């Protein structure tokens, strides 16, 4: 397995993985109506249009096929509150692993890659809106509930964070 930066040619594979996870795993916690709204943002075309604007997006590849994805973006607002002049808080988005490759370290490698890159660009804190299904994974990766509060936000996600320590 290797981790590479996003290229347009990976959009189709990313879309398939994300939408498959949404409709087979996340649907159990959120229902079809919510998943339908979310899934619209993850067609191949939407990924090609929106993902290049993110600070960084990585894909995990096995035999040149996408088996996972994760991306990083600067936080511009936090649930409707504009964050002006933010230069050091970033948000981890769209972490999805192909079902048959879950629990094999792919997600861990992607998060480690995101964290390393975040440190390199001066991030002081990473925020992640985690699905109910993914919450325990991020806890194992050293993330804790934002401001110590374990509650679902308006989107049905737990918000977790991790302070970054720049490695020497």
Locations of the language-model features?
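A short beta-loop-alpha structural element at the N-terminal edge
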Residues: 2-16
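Conserved GNAT-fold acetyl-CoA-binding loop/helix
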Residues: 19-46
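A short helix-loop-beta-strand connector motif used in the catalytic cores of GNAT acetyltransferases and
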Residues: 43-59, 91
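Conserved beta-strand in the GNAT
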Residues: 59, 65-74, 80, 91-96
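Conserved acetyl-CoA-binding loop-helix of GNAT-fold acetyltransferases
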Residues: 94-97, 103-116
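C-terminal "cap" of GNAT-fold acetyltransferases
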Residues: 124-135, 141, 151-168
């Amino acid at each position: 397995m290797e981790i590479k930066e996003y290229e347009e040619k990976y959009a189709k594979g990313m879309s398939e993985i994300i939408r498959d996870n949404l409709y087979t795993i996340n649907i159990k916690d959120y229902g079809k109506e919510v998943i339908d709204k979310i899934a619209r943002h993850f067609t191949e075309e939407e990924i090609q249009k929106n993902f290049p604007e993110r600070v960084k997006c990585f894909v995990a590849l096995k035999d040149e096929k996408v088996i996972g994805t994760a991306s990083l973006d600067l936080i511009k607002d936090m649930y409707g509150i504009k964050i002006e002049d933010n230069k050091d808080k970033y948000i981890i988005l769209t972490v999805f692993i192909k079902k048959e490759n879950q629990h094999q370290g792919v997600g861990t490698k992607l998060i480690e890659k995101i964290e390393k890159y975040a440190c390199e660009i001066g991030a002081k804190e990473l925020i992640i809106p985690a699905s109910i299904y993914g919450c325990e994974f991020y806890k194992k990766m050293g993330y804790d509930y934002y401001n110590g509060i374990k509650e679902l936000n308006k989107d049905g996600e737990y918000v977790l964070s991790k302070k970054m320590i720049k490695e020497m």
